[in-house]
Regions:
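Divalent metal-coordination and catalytic microenvironments
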Residues: 30, 44, 54, 68, ...
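Bacterial N-terminal signal peptides
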Residues: 1-7
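C-terminal regulatory/interaction regions
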Residues: 257-269
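Metallo-beta-lactamase
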Residues: 49-50, 57-59, 132, 139-141, ...
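Boundary at the C-terminal end of the N-terminal hydrophobic targeting segment
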Residues: 8-13
């Protein structure tokens, strides 16, 4: 089921009648969401420049740059990576060539060095646990809570909008919606509940109420029809997703304690 939902959300988005290939959404307070196919990033427009998150790909980054220039003539000063997977962080060279600095958690630099891709720009600035990119009266705060979808994924809070940007590990508005491809070899499922609970606590401390997803989620009707879900959702979705993992681990543990093998447990659950 999770494979079907992941495929439906990322690949089939292009087949939804009336769904534009790209979309630009003004979220307020200088924060914008850009969607290309089933992928989404956010960017902040400030009086001193623009902060862009995941460039998505070389082709998508060109469209993103054009969209930014319809809003402001300020240059892109920073590109922030959510993690190290190529399908999100490819394409930053167009911004690097214009002087932007790339920011990522320190393990992303190692991953990119060990598994290079010609379209992935290595980070210029790395950090361990937290880094805040500040331009004008805006900031993008990057937080690392340990390994999750890869070993360098971060969540980001855009201010003053105070919205959380989350990639791959969950898609709002429904916290129960499965993340994208949980079978990735560098997924660290053991830490997923802790990562999400730490993110939930962060939102509580910051007073944030809204989450922006790094992927387009789809509402699937009883007849199999698919309609695009909203790009934002309640912070509660983070806690719901943490609960999903906690319950799943508990079910697996209970079944294995009853004698189920790793092959039998999924069928029993």
């Amino acid at each position: 089921l999770c494979s079907l939902i992941s495929w439906a959300s990322s690949t089939s988005a292009q087949f939804i009648p009336g769904l534009a290939p790209t979309e630009l959404e003004n979220l307020g307070d200088g924060l914008y969401a850009f969607r290309a196919g089933g992928y989404r990033n956010i960017f902040l427009v400030t009086s001193e420049g623009v902060i862009v998150t995941d460039p998505l790909s070389s082709d998508k980054a060109k469209i993103l740059r054009e969209q930014i220039f319809t809003i402001t003539d300020q240059p892109v000063k920073f590109v922030a990576y959510s993690h190290s997977h190529w399908d999100h962080v490819s394409g930053g060279q167009i911004f690097k060539d214009e002087g932007a600095k790339v920011v990522a958690q320190e393990r992303c630099a190692t991953n990119i060095k060990e598994t290079p891709h010609p379209d992935v720009v290595p980070p210029d600035i790395t950090f361990k646990e937290k880094y805040s990119i500040k331009l004008g009266d805006h900031s993008l705060d990057m937080h690392y809570f340990g390994p999750s979808h890869d070993d360098c994924m971060v969540v980001m809070i855009a201010k003053p909008a105070n919205m959380l940007f989350v990639v791959d590990i969950g898609s709002v508005p429904k916290g129960w919606f499965m993340e994208y491809n949980p079978t990735m070899p560098d997924d660290n499922l053991h830490n997923m509940p802790q990562f999400l609970r730490a993110t939930e606590a962060l939102m509580a401390r910051e007073g944030g109420e809204t989450v922006v997803s790094g992927h387009l989620a789809l509402d699937i009707g009883d007849d199999g029809s698919m309609t695009p879900a909203a790009s934002t959702g309640p912070a509660k979705a983070i806690g719901d997703k943490a609960l999903f993992w906690e319950m799943l681990f508990a079910f697996v543990r209970d079944e294995m304690e009853r004698g189920a093998s790793v092959y039998e447990a999924p069928d029993r659950i």
